[in-house]
Amino acid sequence: MILLKAQSIEAMETAVEYLENINQSLPSIINEYRNQNICDVSEKMVELSDGLRWLYDVAKLTKNYHSINEDEMLGCYAEIVDAMEMKDYLLLSDLLEYELLPLTENWKAMLIDSVKSIATN
């Protein structure tokens, strides 16, 4: 049980670092979509998509230690994928700015609080 707890803390700390990277890179991704620089931003979106899937997996595996709503995460991801498939880059940039960015900031805060709480117990 102690090993599982330590692994969960490590996974959540890594997720916090990744969320910080997402929060720093999202504004440039949003601007590139708004400026129709689709070729330039495509690789970044693939990396972001992979990262969001990884975050979802971490959230599910560590759900006993935090209050992140995985369904909310999955719903946001599905909307982003739909916008990408429709090639609606204005919608995509809005989803990234007004849906994903606030969610990632919230998830980061929740994970930080969870790690602190677990570490003191």
Describe the predicted segments one by one.
Residues 1-121:
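C-terminal-biased regions
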